[in-house]
UniProtKB/Swiss-Prot annotation:
Gene coding for it: mcm6
Similarity annotation: Belongs to the MCM family.
Occurrences of domain MCM (ranges): 420-626
Catalytic activity line of the entry: ATP + H2O = ADP + phosphate + H(+)
GO terms for cellular component: MCM complex; nucleus
Binding site for ADP: 693, 696
Region ranges (Disordered): 51-76
Gene Ontology BP term (one): mitotic DNA replication
Pfam families: MCM (PF00493), MCM6_C (PF18263), MCM_lid (PF17855), MCM_N (PF14551), MCM_OB (PF17207)
Keyword Thylakoid assigned: no
Protein name, UniProt field: DNA replication licensing factor mcm6
EC nos: 3.6.4.12
Known role: Acts as a component of the MCM2-7 complex (MCM complex) which is the replicative helicase essential for 'once per cell cycle' DNA replication initiation and elongation in eukaryotic cells. Core component of CDC45-MCM-GINS (CMG) helicase, the molecular machine that unwinds template DNA during replication, and around which the replisome is built.
Length: 867
């Protein structure tokens, strides 16, 4: 832990107490001036009303009331007050009412009140901070004496937190010139420690004579008195801390990584440790992009300094055996090491940022997923929402009121729009031409279903997972990048470059304390957001298994290094995958084209197959769209809604939790029964097995459509649209007819999958390729394999002629074919068997024969019925 002097008044704490002599204390004139000016600011600053420029000439009472209502909240999210009382006196009242100890100061107010005071605090905030805290104590003592008595009795540390600081610095721009000055930085939180107590002012007892020391301010590390106050005691090292008389505050350390937009080309992102105290702890979570306001300081590296006198400062060199060591075993290292120690001597100081206030760059309502009923919305206090916790919108009306007038008007137009579904589809990723079905799926993923909990407290996810499969250069990755560009808590990662720990979470050891902490992975960082995974098929099988739990249960379980935890990963997953071999083979099913296991495929609600087909008309339109994009850029798109309008509409719909009426329940059950019948009958070959998860997908998609249309009930039309999307995703497989071989007997040119299975001639020459519908071929091949398995001759094998005779006899008895069609069906069956042996590797010739009909066939050891 890092100990600091936060919350210490110089009148109450002394660093070096003297035994006998009392020296006259020298007053810092700058601190005295700052204290008086800040006290004057707290007493006299009043927030003036803002008047709409358009209504400057209207002085009637109605216009004044309208202006007051429209500007009830300022741009900082703070409710504006009337000017009959000091603004910050009211803020102190709120602070006391909310049981907080931090007063939030808008730095713009301070600079407006006194530019000299603002400039002084910007330049030397670390030096002047005790003075403004003294001013706050005097202010509270004057107006709220009862609260001040409680502060003194309970040893509460009062603090001042500034926001809206004009000086913004990038993480990699922090230099020694910034030490002690006030500035704000922005970054993404990657790791948070647990909240611990921090010793601010320590009171110690001498172990020799039991004399109490004066309060000792902790200077970045555990600091004890230099000498006992008892003149008859010579103790300088043996001390016992007096916990009852000491002052503690909450402390938390977070690691922040600079934003992607701030990283120069060819550079890796920089990280910085930030210390939070008091009311600021637990306001930043892993994955949040926040703005921190505070001061940069250099602190002693306690882990290096606390080892002892024989600390090994030079790597690989024993302190007492080499030349240059004193006789007593201590290294004689001076302040100047020279060029020989460059890169060898350990640094005893390091940079740390002490933050006063934390403000999320996006409101908690921007989260894509709304929690189950009963959960706290957002999970943590909003921005500097400690000022007024009532500002968090709790209904559609309050959310509308919190928007600026221009955004409110545009949102009201969207609410009244009759073609909102199609307009939103046209507004999603306008730089991509076509792909309307994919845009519909992505749009429904943004709105999501309703999170639920069973009576057994089992969570039922409402997030929708989508996977886009297709040929290269079909704009798969563009959809992922588009969502990352404007949605909050959206994380982009690549499957090939990500490990299981990088996607879920890992346990790391704190170098200072030695404790093990959990560091969030991509799925944890995207909690209440979207995780975009590119090259999903390139993930290792072990890494794919790691995200099974996160995709269905939406949790990540960790049991490492003595840590047993179940972490939230309530995120939607948008994945992009390439087919095996780089191109989608239409003669194979979706599962055969993807390097993804069946359990993982069933966790996706929607699959979309995108093919790069040569079509002169579509190619011309796509090329024209791309050229216009390069020529006119943003002006080339004519999207009905902007990204900001889409985000506001999504936030607005999150307050709606649609329910399912009885008529929709029966319709959902009917659609599910039909999908299961397709899976077993073979009339249409599904892309993968239909399970109960597909029924839950239907429910989620229907709820998302109802939420999109602002309906509180899931109407049958929403269920039908959800079923259409799901069937297009899992039943409609992009396949060509299967080529069986050459037809030399003028028997068949094209085998159609009609009711009678009759062959038709295609062409007049009588010579061509024999083709078969893919669904018919798949059904026939599975039937032949199943017969070999059920005959009990899996190991010994079966003659090809016996297998064909069984199939023809079965077709005749079932009335599927007639006696006139036996010769044609026999030839087709022989060609299917040849393809199963030579192409599909589903059958193996165990005993060859010069006559193909008499060879012995067995099932290939690697054959799977689920293919």
């Amino acid at each position: 832990m890092i100990y600091t002097d936060a919350g210490v008044d110089e009148d109450k704490a002394t660093i070096r107490p003297n035994q006998t002599h009392q020296f006259q204390k020298v007053q810092d004139e700058a601190k005295e001036w700052t204290k008086n000016k800040f006290l004057e600011f707290l007493n006299n600053f009043k927030l003036k009303k803002k008047i709409d420029k358009n209504n400057n000439n209207n002085n009637n009472e109605d216009n004044e009331d309208n202006n007051e209502n429209e500007n009830e909240y300022d741009e900082n999210g703070i409710k504006k007050e009337k000017i009959d009382k000091s603004y910050y006196r009211q803020q102190v009242e709120r602070m006391i009412k909310n049981d907080k100890s931090s007063l939030y100061i808008d730095f713009l107010h301070l600079e407006k009140f006194d530019k000299g005071l603002g400039k002084a605090l910007l330049m030397e905030y670390f030096r002047l901070e005790p003075a403004i805290r003294q001013g706050l104590s005097i202010f509270i003592q004057k107006y709220f004496p009862s609260f001040m008595e409680r502060v003194n009795k309970e040893r509460i540390v009062l603090s001042i937190c500034c926001y809206n600081v004009s000086t913004f610095v990038h993480i990699r721009e922090l230099r020694s010139s910034r030490i002690g000055s006030l500035c704000s930085i922005s970054g993404t939180v990657t790791r948070t420690s647990e909240v611990r107590p921090e010793l601010v002012i320590g009171s110690f007892i001498c172990k020799d004579c039991n004399t109490s020391s004066l309060p000792i301010a902790q200077q970045f590390k555990y600091t004890e008195p230099t000498k006992c106050l008892n003149p008859l005691c010579s103790n300088q090292r043996r001390w016992k801390i007096n916990l009852e008389e000491s002052t503690f505050t909450d402390w938390q350390k977070v690691r922040v990584q600079e934003n992607n937009s701030e990283i120069p080309g060819g550079s890796v992102p920089r990280s910085l440790e930030i210390i939070l105290r008091g009311d600021s702890v637990e306001t930043a979570r892993a994955g949040d992009t926040c703005t921190f306001v505070g001061t940069m300081n250099v602190i002693p590296d306690v882990s290096k300094m606390s080892i002892g006198n024989n600390a090994q400062i030079i790597k690989g060199v024993a302190s007492s055996t080499k030349e240059g060591s004193n006789a007593n075993g201590k290294d004689d290292f001076g302040g100047v090491g020279g060029l020989k120690d460059l890169g060898v001597r350990e640094m005893n100081y390091r940079v740390c940022f002490f933050s006063q206030s934390v403000r999320s760059n996006v409101s908690t309502l921007s989260s894509i997923n709304r929690k189950e009923s009963g959960d706290n919305h957002g999970g943590h206090s909003h921005s500097v929402g400690i000022i007024d916790e009532d500002l968090e919108p709790e209904s559609k009306e309050s959310f509308l009121d919190s928007l600026p007038k221009k955004e409110k008007d545009s949102l009201k137009k969207m609410i009244k729009s009759k073609k909102i579904y199609q307009n939103l589809v046209n507004s999603i990723c306008p730089s991509i031409f076509g792909h309307e079905e994919i845009k519909r799926g992505v749009l429904l993923m943004l709105f999501g279903g309703v999170h639920k909990k069973t009576p057994e407290k089992i969570r039922l996810r409402g997030d929708i997972n989508v996977c886009i499969v297709g040929d290269p250069s079909t704009s798969k990755s563009t959809f992922l990048k588009y969502l990352v560009s404007f949605l909050p808590r959206t994380v982009y990662t690549s499957g090939k470059a990500s490990s299981a720990a990088g996607l879920t979470a890992t346990v790391v050891k704190d170098q200072e304390s030695g404790d093990f902490n959990i560091e969030a992975g991509a799925l944890m960082l995207a909690d209440n957001g979207i995780c975009c995974i590119d090259e999903f098929d390139k993930m290792e099988p072990g890494d794919q298994v790691a995200i099974h739990e996160a995709m269905e249960q939406q949790t990540i379980s960790i049991a490492k290094a003595g840590i047993h935890a179940s972490l939230n990963a309530r995120t939607s997953i948008l994945a992009a995958a390439n087919p095996i071999g780089g191109r989608y083979d239409r003669n194979k099913t979706l599962k055969q084209n993807l390097n993804i296991g069946g359990p993982l495929m069933s966790r996706f609600d929607l699959f979309f197959v995108v093919l790069d087909e040569c079509n002169p008309e579509s190619d011309h339109r796509i090329a024209e769209h791309i050229v216009l994009t390069h020529q006119k850029r943003e002006k080339a798109f004519n999207a009905p809604f902007s990204a900001t309008e889409i985000k506001n509409y999504i936030k607005y719909t999150k307050f709606i939790c649609p329910t399912i009426p009885d008529e929709s329940v029966q319709l959902l059950v009917g659609h599910y029964d039909r999908l299961r019948q397709m899976d077993t009958s073979g009339s249409k070959t599904p892309a993968y097995r239909i399970t109960v998860r597909q029924l839950e997908s239907l429910v989620r998609l229907s709820e998302s459509l109802a939420r999109l249309h602002l309906d509180t009930k899931v109407l049958p039309k929403y269920v039908n649209e959800a079923a259409r999307l799901l069937e297009k995703s899992i039943v409609h497989v992009e396949t060509n007819d299967v080529i069986l071989g050459d037809d030399d007997d003028d028997l068949v040119k094209n085998v159609e999958n009609d009711n009678d299975n009759h062959a038709e001639e295609d062409g007049d020459d009588g010579i061509g390729k024999l083709t078969m519908n893919f669904s018919k071929y798949s059904q026939l091949s599975k039937l032949l394999v199943l017969q070999i398995k059920q005959s009990g001759k899996e190991k010994s094998g079966i003659k090809q002629i016996d297998l064909i005779d069984w199939y023809i006899k079965d077709q005749l008895e079932s009335g599927i074919i007639t006696d006139d069609e036996v010769t044609k069906e026999t030839k087709i069956t022989k060609m299917v068997i040849n393809k199963m042996i030579n192409k599909d590797n589903s059958l193996v010739v165990l005993v060859p024969n010069q006559y193909p009909d008499h060879r012995i066939l067995i099932i290939h050891p690697n054959y799977s019925f689920d293919k």
